[in-house]
């Protein structure tokens, strides 16, 4: 009887071993997410027929370029080019940013944060002196135009870039250029961003 019990126990051991729950297989590792691919920058626009010198604006957010329209706004373009060549805009900050509308710069007060309450009120001290409103150069997306406080002839050093077409401004402000490269940069500008350098493209 004892022998029979021992034999039965010995025979049951292999069955007990194989009856154990198999160890869980390791789960396959989840695939690593792919790094996001940056969208390519928009291709530069072709210069407009009759366009003049191109002005490069290097900012803390990147660089954009705009063509000028000396045929339609000769006095304005001459005035802006003179300011650019004497480095008037270097170190100035963008003092006005309205998303989907405009970005604006050109006030020397913006070099000084203690004068922030005066940002947008100053210029070079020498206005253009002539209103050169044009029916040809309109406020399309990327237009560059002169800011003023009521009289286009008194526009001085402040200019703005339209972030979308703004036809309601046509005939009220002198459009003297258009962004042809780096339009995506203009949409990233915020109040306080600095113009590191502004120069005429060789």
Predicted segments, located by residue:
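Bacterial N-terminal signal peptides that target proteins for export
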Residues: 1-7
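Hydrophobic alpha-helical transmembrane segments of integral membrane proteins
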Residues: 10-11
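Cyclophilin-like peptidyl-prolyl cis-trans isomerases
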Residues: 3, 17-202
């Amino acid at each position: 009887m004892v022998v029979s019990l021992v034999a039965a126990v010995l025979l049951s051991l292999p069955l007990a071993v194989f009856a154990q729950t198999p160890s869980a297989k390791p789960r396959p590792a989840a695939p690593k997410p792919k790094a996001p691919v940056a969208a390519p920058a928009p291709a530069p626009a072709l210069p407009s027929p009759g366009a003049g010198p191109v002005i490069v604006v290097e900012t803390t957010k990147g660089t954009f370029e705009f063509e000028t329209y000396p045929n339609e706004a000769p006095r304005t373009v001459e005035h802006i080019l003179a300011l650019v060549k004497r480095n008037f805009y270097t170190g100035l900050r963008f003092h006005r940013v309205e998303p989907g509308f405009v970005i604006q710069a050109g006030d020397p007060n913006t070099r000084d944060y203690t004068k922030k309450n005066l940002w947008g009120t100053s210029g070079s001290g020498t206005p253009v002196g002539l209103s050169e409103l044009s029916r040809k150069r309109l406020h399309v997306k990327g237009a560059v135009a002169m800011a003023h406080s009521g009289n286009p002839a008194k526009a001085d050093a402040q200019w703005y870039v339209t972030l979308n077409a703004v036809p309601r401004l046509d005939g009220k402000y002198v459009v003297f250029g258009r962004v042809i490269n780096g339009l995506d940069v203009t949409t990233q500008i915020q109040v306080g961003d600095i113009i590191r350098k502004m120069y005429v493209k060789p």
